[in-house]
Structures are given as C-alpha cells and as structure tokens.
C-alpha cells in the first residue's frame, strides 16, 4: 500500500509540474502577443506596402478566375439596369467607356472566348474592375503548361501589362486549371506604380492617294491589352509649317490594326478592326485637300505619360528624302525594324 501511495504522489507531482509549465507558457504567449500589438509589429513581410500588394494580387486573381465577370455600359452615366455578364461581347470602345470586371470562367472552366476578349480591355480598365488602387498597375499572363498536343505546350494565350522591372515593388498571385486535356496557368502581377508599356506602331502611310481617295495612316497595337488613344498625339511637319492633333477618344484593341483616315466613307478598310475619322478634325485630307505634304514631310506619333507634360516620339516617318519620293497611289510601308529611321521604310 505504501508503494502505491508513493507512485500516486509522484504522478500527482508530475501532473502539477506539467500544469505549471503549460500555465507559464500560456502566460508567456499572452505577454508576447500583447507586446507585438503594442509595438504595432506585423508578422510576415513586416512591410504594410507589400502586404497591401499581396492582398490586391490575391483578390484580383480571385475576381478574375471565380466567375463570368460583368459589364456596366455607359449612357449619360453608368447604366446598371443593362449590366450583363456577357462583357466579352462588347466592343473595345464600349468597354472603355463603361465599367468592366473581366471574368474568365464559364461553367467552372476557363472560357477561351473571354480570354480572347481581353484584347478589348485596357490595362487601366481591368485594374479598375478588379478593384486595384489608382497607384497600382498590373501584368497578366495566361499560358498552356501541358497539352495532349505537343505544339501547344508553352503557348501564350495572353501576356500584357506593365513590366515588373518598372515598379519598385510587386506581388504575384498564381492559379492553374486542368481541363480538356490541357493545364493552364493564370498569373496576375500587381505593381506599386510602374511605367505603362504603351507602344503603338505606324505600319503604313498613304500621303498621295490616287483617284481622289483619302489620306490614311495605319496603326498597329502590338500589345495584348487594348490602348486608349487619350494622351496620344500626331504631329506633321513640312518645311516651316507644323500641325498637331491631340487625340481625345478612341480605343485600339490589342494585336489589331486601326486606320486613321481623311474620309471613312471612301476608305478601303481591309483587315483593320477600327476606323477613326481625322478628316473632320482637319489633320488628314481627301481628294484635292491635303493634310499631309505631297513633297517632303515628317509625321510623328507621340505619347505623354500621365505624370509628364512633354510628349515623347514613339514613331517617326519621313518622306521626300533619298529613296522615299512618292508618286500618286504609292504608300510608305514600315519594314518592322527601327521606328525612327527612314531606312526602315519602303515604297509600295
């Protein structure tokens, strides 16, 4: 009996020691938690700005890949009564004027029609729809990681937006999808600021049209996102005479061609997706009315960043110089090299 009593006393002592240890450890955790709260320390990155980007990237990707999305058109204000989930059927101009939250899903799968329609959305329009702050920018990429068709492995379905290297800090959210024998990745990067990758290319210019046709300028958007023309301008110089046009409206879809023309009614559209009338604005001519010089001239496409006041040349086209003397019906065609050198242009 005495031996049993000794065992019982030892067990009670051990239990008491364990309880005292747990109580002390719990008290320690409470003190540590209170200290961290008072010191306003944050676990994880210890940087509120980075945490803010992390939340924005995570929420943005969730909104992008959790549903069909929505579009609210503009009609003297946002027309909520005619809002729709079929945002992918709206034009680039309509999407830019209204409010869109692109969603990529249909019946719980990635919808290729919606992915293709991202070319009609501007980066700023997507950022606003996903709820990003005004000082944030984004980059979105969608790729085929695995496929039953080896030729589709690594295929880029969309890759556009502000490059990470132009921003001081960034955060990335990633999601993969397995469907129809393929695996896709959707990667959303959210940046603190950054310089927009706004590049447009003048690919062909008609200075001396034949048969009383209109002057025209063909512009290509090599980006996957659409680009709004607000902030873009054109400058034409011939001798001591110069004319400028600040573009106030219009959107060019990603990976598409647009025509700026002196007369839309007589313009041959070809494979252009958009036609903008610059004849009514007096910049391009038609018939006997010249907007661009028939002799020697210089045309510049310019862009002004939102935080700058001076426009920067993006493309320059010069004619009436060696090898580039035009006759009626000939156009200047860019060969795809230097956007500022006359040697990159030929006659067609």
Predicted ranges, named:
Residues 2, 8-39:
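N-terminal single-pass transmembrane signal-anchor helix
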Residues 194-239, 289-294, 311-326:
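A structural motif detector for short, solvent-exposed N-terminal "entry" segments of globular domains
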Residues 241-277:
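Intrinsically disordered, low-complexity Pro/Gly/Ser/Thr-rich segments with frequent PxxP/GP/PP motifs
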Residues 281-348:
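Conserved beta-structured recognition patch
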């Amino acid at each position: 009996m005495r031996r049993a009593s000794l065992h019982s006393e030892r067990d009670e002592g051990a239990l008491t020691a364990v309880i005292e240890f747990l109580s002390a450890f719990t008290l320690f955790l409470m003190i540590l938690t209170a200290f961290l709260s008072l010191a306003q320390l944050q676990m994880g990155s210890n940087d509120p700005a980075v945490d803010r980007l992390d939340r924005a990237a995570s929420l943005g990707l969730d909104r992008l890949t959790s549903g069909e999305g929505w579009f609210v058109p503009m009609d003297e204000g946002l027309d909520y009564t005619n809002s729709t989930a079929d945002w992918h059927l709206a034009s680039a101009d309509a999407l830019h004027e209204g409010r869109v939250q692109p969603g990529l899903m249909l019946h719980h799968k990635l919808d290729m029609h919606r992915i293709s329609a991202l070319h009609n959305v501007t980066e700023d329009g997507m950022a606003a729809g996903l709820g990003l702050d005004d000082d944030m920018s984004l980059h979105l990429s969608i790729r085929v990681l695995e496929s039953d068709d080896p030729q589709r492995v690594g295929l880029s379905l969309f890759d556009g937006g502000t490059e990470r290297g132009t921003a001081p800090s960034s955060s990335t959210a990633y999601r993969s999808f397995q469907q129809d024998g393929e695996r896709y990745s959707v990667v959303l990067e959210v940046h603190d600021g950054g310089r927009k990758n706004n590049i447009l290319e003048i690919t062909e210019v008609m200075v001396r049209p034949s048969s009383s046709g209109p002057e025209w300028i063909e512009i290509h958007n090599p980006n996957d996102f659409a680009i709004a023309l607000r902030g873009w301008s054109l400058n034409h110089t011939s001798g001591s005479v110069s004319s400028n046009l600040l573009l106030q409206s219009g959107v060019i879809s990603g990976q598409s061609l647009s025509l700026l023309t002196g007369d839309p009614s007589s313009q041959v559209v070809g494979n252009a997706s958009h036609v903008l009338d610059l004849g009514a604005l007096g910049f391009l001519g038609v018939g006997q009315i010249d907007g661009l010089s028939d002799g020697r001239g210089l045309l510049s496409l310019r862009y002004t960043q939102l935080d700058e006041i001076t426009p920067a040349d993006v493309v320059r086209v010069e004619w009436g110089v060696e090898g580039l003397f035009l006759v009626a019906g000939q156009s200047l065609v860019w060969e795809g090299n230097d956007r500022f050198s006359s040697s990159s242009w030929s006659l067609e």
